[in-house]
Amino acid sequence: MKLIASHCVFPTPDIQKTTEFYVEKLGFRRVEYLDAKEKHICLYRDRVELILTQANSQRIYPNRELYGYGEDAYVITECQQELQDEFGQKGVKIVRTLHKTDYNNLEFTIEDIDGMWICFVIKQSLYFHDFVLSTLK
């Protein structure tokens, strides 16, 4: 038995407004489940899925506010400069430009419409790189 994938679940104060941001600014497509018992919207781009849920409050607290640091999601990617340029051209707030971290990842971070920080990363671990390549075949 092995684990296959993981999805981020983001509560949001305005599920439609947040969905529009992800579709228009980040290039995701949406699938709505608003008639389901637990209403949600799934967002897809390439092999990434994010799930939005309607929050019971008008304010969302990202990890950095709750715990002092940290992004709210890591998305493994490639062609980061192109992706950062794409987001920048669409007016997405880039809070950390593309850089190499002290743990040898290449990453940049954006802030979504609700204040969540999403990091787009290329992990430098050879094991991880080989694993990702093997799953794409």
Annotate each language-model stretch with its function.
Residues 1-7, 29-78, 84-111, 122-137:
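Vicinal oxygen chelate
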Residues 14-15, 78-80:
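Helix N-cap motif at beta-to-alpha junctions
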Residues 12-15, 102:
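Conserved beta-strand-loop-alpha-helix junction that forms the acyl-donor binding cleft
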Residues 18, 22-23, 87, 115:
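Conserved active-site tyrosine of GNAT-family acetyltransferases
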